[in-house]
């Protein structure tokens, strides 16, 4: 039979946004948190709509939904909502939209995703958690205040501080360092256009966070 696979929220957000734009004549932007895939940006650009980047926390996207500003908004931690729907993260609507998408396109999800990648490009994302001592955490916070020039040998083209420190790199990749408010953990997010670059970014993740 067909290979079964789990699809990440990041991938689902890209596919669902594309599906909504292909099947509804809704006006409005797309929104995602700073920690969420730029696949959403690529789909938004393809459909010629604006992209809004928010801090982490669904309330920011919920607010945009409540004011009818966006077609869809979502986060990599599996929360999304759509225009005219509740301003809360709703996994049920996500599942229903995926079912609708598969039924209307008459293709398995794997094909829908590979077709989307062929259309807008491939985006691969990973999240790592690093446990830090208080001393390491203090040093990491100080390090992040300086704008890093390179990450894993790639030039930083832009630093975004919507929530944590996000470095957008020259090769359409990015990394984000965020401190958990509740535990001595640093979250490190990385995204690249190919597996080799992603591996490189993740291998450097801990050293980059600790500034060693």
Residue ranges and their predicted role:
Residues 1-3, 15, 22, 26-212:
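Phosphate-binding and adjacent anionic-ligand microenvironments
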Residues 8:
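Polar interaction faces of repeat-based domains
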């Amino acid at each position: 039979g067909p290979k079964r696979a789990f699809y990440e929220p990041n991938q689902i957000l890209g596919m669902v946004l594309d599906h909504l734009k292909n099947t509804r004549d809704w006006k409005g932007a797309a929104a995602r948190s700073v920690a969420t895939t730029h696949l959403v940006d690529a789909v938004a650009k393809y459909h010629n709509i604006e992209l809004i980047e928010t801090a982490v926390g669904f309330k920011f996207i919920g607010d945009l939904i409540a004011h009818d500003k966006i077609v869809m908004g979502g986060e990599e931690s599996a929360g999304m909502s759509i225009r005219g729907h509740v301003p809360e993260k709703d996994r049920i609507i996500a599942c229903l939209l995926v079912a609708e998408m598969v039924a209307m396109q008459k293709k398995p999800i794997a094909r829908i995703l590979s077709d989307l990648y062929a259309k807008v490009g491939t985006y691969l994302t990973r999240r790592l958690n690093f446990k830090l001592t208080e001393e390491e955490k203090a040093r990491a916070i100080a390090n992040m205040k300086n704008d890093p020039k390179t990450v894993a040998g790639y030039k930083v083209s832009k630093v975004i501080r919507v929530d944590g420190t996000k470095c957008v790199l020259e090769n359409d990749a990015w990394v984000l360092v965020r401190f958990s408010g509740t535990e001595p953990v640093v979250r490190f997010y990385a995204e690249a256009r190919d597996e080799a670059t992603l591996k490189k970014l993740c291998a450097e993740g801990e050293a980059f966070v600790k500034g060693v």
